[in-house]
């Protein structure tokens, strides 16, 4: 049975899940939040690019518009970045810039239709693999802020921004917070 599931998942373009459930528990699986089966899921292919090289900027711009509900600034792609992590169908991405302080996660986005699929966690695991120490910011009203709180080692709350960090030495936290507060907006 696992071989059949593997073949099925290999032939679909996006991440997809298959639930294996006992027939007696089928209704519970369908109609409750706490399912009764075992979920088997194919992961997404995440491409890692140095800088903006080989990134389809138009598709990335569309992803940001879908995820954030507003357009990215025209000069966003002229800013230097160290690495971009992009799901093969541009349903999710992360952008990391090098700063004088530490790596800065400037964008982390999953398109609205893919939110809840685990894609963000897949991208996040690659970012944290490549960057064990970095910082980022989020608007207080951002719905993902509570997830960020679980991922960070620390945070400071300001009226306009919440500043998060992970793996930073204590002497770097102050300069990282100052950098994040001073960074210009990515949206027009």
Located regions from the model:
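C-terminal catalytic "cap/lid" subdomain
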Residues: 1-102, 106-121, 125-126, 130-134, ...
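Conserved active-site alpha-helix within GNAT-family acetyltransferase domains
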Residues: 140-163
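Conserved hydrophobic beta-strand within the GNAT/NAT acetyltransferase core sheet
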Residues: 136-138
